[in-house]
Amino acid sequence: FVHIKAIDDLGHDKNLDDRITMIENIDKIIGGTLKTLGETYRDMIVVVGGDHTTNIHIGDHSFEPVPFIVTRLEIYKALTNGEDISREALRDNVQAFNEIDCAKGVLGRFPGSEVMEFLKNIRQRIKQINSS
């Protein structure tokens, strides 16, 4: 679990340029970390989401659904290597990680209280696949 408060703070400050730069920098750091972990922890579940939205225009929490993405580390690694994963993953056509696009994905919208049970179910399914 990693919580990065700076993204929220920059939203409260209405500082769009620095917020974009911070998100891009974090994206690079997470990508590098996942590549390193991928050598050892291929079945690790990777989840990216937020605990709430902070609207840059009003500088306060806005209570829209947060974008949420989940994958196995092995699938992330295959994607970054340009491999075809069509047989390996439940995919959708979402091409951008934002509130509107992610809500249109296969996960749709769901309350945050369901996240842990959802992840437990994914973990159990991975164990079943690996044992067969």
Predicted stretch roles:
Residues 1-132:
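Feature captures the catalytic ectodomains and active-site-proximal regions of enzymes
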